Amino acid sequence: MSLVAIGINHKTATVDLREKVAFSPDKIHDAMKSLASRTRSGEAVIVSTCNRTELYCNNGDEADIIEWLEEYHGLDHQDVAPCLYNYHGQAAVRHLMRVASGLDSLILGEPQILGQVKQAFVKAKEAGTVALTIDRMFQNTFSVAKKVRTETEIGAAAVSVAFAAVSMAKHIFSSLSTTKVLLIGAGETIELVAKHLKDNGVASMVVANRTLERAQSMCEEFNATAITLAQIPDFLPKADIVISSTASPLPILGKGMVEKALKQRRHQPMLLVDIAVPRDIEPEVADLDDAFLYTVDDLHSIIEQNKASRKEAAEQAELITEEQSHLFMEWVRSLESVDSIREYRSQSMAIKDELVERALNKLAQGGDTEQVLIELANRLTNRLIHAPTQALTVASRQGDLNTLGQLRTVLGLDKN
């Protein structure tokens, strides 16, 4: 039994090559069936994200799997091979556990990868490319990722601006589910902020953008309300949290607009997070009572502190993946021992059946009973001791005392 992990990721390849080896959702079902057909066990899972494409197989040949990947995407070996990494046995299991735990991610400890690995596993089950070993490998991996999350602080500290902004909001408001949020801008950073807010239970979001169409497109995913920048004064008084990130050269929110909104809110506190450069919110807003303004510099200082915290947590997480991958391989070896015992017994029974049938035929033809039994015993003995005798001979000729000692123990030659 041989577990193999072959992949390419953000550390080894450019985005251009990663795009070429990626598998689209509508094709991954058939791709996994095709890959599984190249393994002896029919087991394969493909994990394909923007940052990585990885193939996990049981009883597959490394060179054959790489050839399949290149053929599937129509790529030249010399273009792909230098960017590939591969792991076998326990190293393959540990790599999967590290990936699912966020230890191999671009942002250390990011939680999204676990969901992506789970989704890949579900698709593999739907494709019928999962059997006992791969199933157990992935189920154990999900348990390990959960263990890493609960027993370390790997995911507790924010290490991206978007995540840090939402984490700050969580510290100030006891529950985000009842807060009203105004997002200004509709770019990638604000979209990521919206995702983190949704994951934390925020149900009421308004997205303000210069072009309404872009805001509407983003709002569909998050069930939010889209408005233009000109409508901000009407919605600002309702906002408990304001997070802004636009490319505007001039501030979007001035001190006067925020002051007016706070009066309408009867001086309920408002958190404002400005993650734009240049700034979207006038710095004088921080002088207002009940307005709590944080800039991207404030967030970066938090992020740097948290990176150090995550590195400490990562060291603990690495120990967990090492221990758990070792335990998994012990289970795999127990399966192999059961298979070996079954195969050895089956082989011995086949020899016995063959020789007994030959002896019965001779008896039926009038052969001497004593002679037939002696011949049966001799033939059976010779056949059964043939392989052990060969192994002992080879070990003796090579002076391999370790193997010789193990063989003597297995064959019971050292018993008194």
Curated annotation (Swiss-Prot):
MF GO annotations: glutamyl-tRNA reductase activity; NADP binding
Binding site for NADP(+): G185, A186, G187, E188, T189, I190
Enzyme's top EC category: oxidoreductase
Pathway listed: Porphyrin-containing compound metabolism; protoporphyrin-IX biosynthesis; 5-aminolevulinate from L-glutamyl-tRNA(Glu): step 1/2
NADP among keywords: yes
Enzyme Commission code(s) on record: 1.2.1.70
GO biological process per UniProt: protoporphyrinogen IX biosynthetic process from glutamate
Transmembrane segments: none
Positions of the record's site feature: Important for activity: H95
Disulphide connectivity of cysteines: none
Superkingdom, natural source: Bacteria
Binding site for substrate: T49, C50, N51, R52, S105, E110, P111, Q112, Q116
Entry coiled-coil feature ranges: none
InterPro entries reported in the protein's UniProt record: 4pyrrol_synth_GluRdtase, 4pyrrol_synth_GluRdtase_dimer, 4pyrrol_synth_GluRdtase_N, GluRdtase_CS, GluRdtase_dimer_dom_sf, GluRdtase_N_sf, NAD(P)-bd_dom_sf, Shikm_DH/Glu-tRNA_Rdtase
Quaternary structure and partners: Homodimer.
Function as written in the Swiss-Prot or TrEMBL entry: Catalyzes the NADPH-dependent reduction of glutamyl-tRNA(Glu) to glutamate 1-semialdehyde (GSA).
Protein family: Belongs to the glutamyl-tRNA reductase family.
Further information: During catalysis, the active site Cys acts as a nucleophile attacking the alpha-carbonyl group of tRNA-bound glutamate with the formation of a thioester intermediate between enzyme and glutamate, and the concomitant release of tRNA(Glu). The thioester intermediate is finally reduced by direct hydride transfer from NADPH, to form the product GSA.
Name used for this protein in its record: Glutamyl-tRNA reductase
Protein's organism: Shewanella sp. (strain MR-4)
Organism classification: Bacteria, Pseudomonadati, Pseudomonadota, Gammaproteobacteria, Alteromonadales
Gene of this entry: hemA
